[in-house]
Amino acid sequence: MAAARACIVALALVAALFVAGSAAAAAGNAGGRPQLSLRQRRRQLLRQRQVRSHLKRLNKAPLATIESPDGDIIDCVHISNQPALDHPFLKNHTVQMRPAYHPEGLYDDESKVASQRNAQTITQMWHQNGRCPEGTIPIRRTKEEDVLRASSVRRYGKKKRRSAPNPMSVDPDMLNESGHQHAIAYVEGDKYYGAKATINVWQPKIEQANEFSLSQLWILGGSFGQDLNSIEAGWQVSPDLYGDNNTRLFTYWTSDAYQATGCYNLLCSGFIQINNQIAMGASIFPTSSYSGSQYDISILIWKDPKEGNWWMQFGKDYVLGYWPSFLFSYLADSASMVEWGGEVVNSQADGVHTSTQMGSGHFPEEGFGRASYFKGVQVVDSSNNLGAPRGGLGTFTEQSSCYDVQSGSNADWGTYFYYGGPGRSSSCQ
């Protein structure tokens, strides 16, 4: 009898545990949330640890912090504590605070640009709430949600492969398979030591969060296979990278065709910033409006003939910093091609072309105030002279019915081109 009574008690206990477990499972599934398996929970915890470790490497201790009206947090980090100096080859690097040489003819060109009528002032949004002190650089703080939007921690802040357009390609359809489309002007066939342009600034509409639209210049060396070297700068709208649709200043570099090396802005060791006024990846404003005010930014990238580093200047006042020459193989000497223009990601959701806009979202033939442009397009030659490309510009686009480009030259703008388009339309499916 005692044994039977013990058996009944044991069965009751098992039943109670089963009911409690079922109730807990039901509570866990409230709202339709599926229960994670032990393996899934471990994977989730591992990713969280990886993200937090990555954030710790990227977000250096600031001496001051500025909250931007657009939600960004700008950390003012001591110049000697910036992410670039984490690179093993830069552990004992003495930061070069100014280039040994600027290109010849630069200031003649800027005097001409400054005297043009209807010049509009453009700035960064965080400036409304303060500036970083001397001896620091402004760094846009990376948030946990920024990293979580990436396909992996390792790929955060990196472009997809085959992102640089190859105008020599005989098979545009093959380029379309990469999901990237372009409308560019270019020069090739010589040695180039820099490039400059004034870029019209817009806020193009993005259809899918995993797409982007940018306008930039590319300094290129090597082949379009596994060893491409590229230095890039311009403006972009990229919800996946930044979490919003703001127009932002950006830089990029790679020494292996976007495979393992390089990144946007200061999201890895590479670009050494010296300027305390301009933040890479921060919003720029105002932007141009259709048939309204037009706003431009000017970008110059050149190779210092003495030190060999590649420098970047924003506008006529801000020398931002440099990419050390050791980061590159081909670009350690010179560039073999320079490109300027627009790029979008076409994810082809539902099997149709994206409606993500390039430039202003309007075709080149609409002209000033409606179509986006690059003007004052120049290159730096082997004598460190800045001037118009000899022989003019080549142009390239994969699908001119979606995004197009038209180049020209005149006394006011020098070498220029209009570019862009709406993406999906009656003529672009």
What are the language-model segments listed below?
Residues 2-429:
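Exposed, interaction-prone regions of secreted/extracellular proteins
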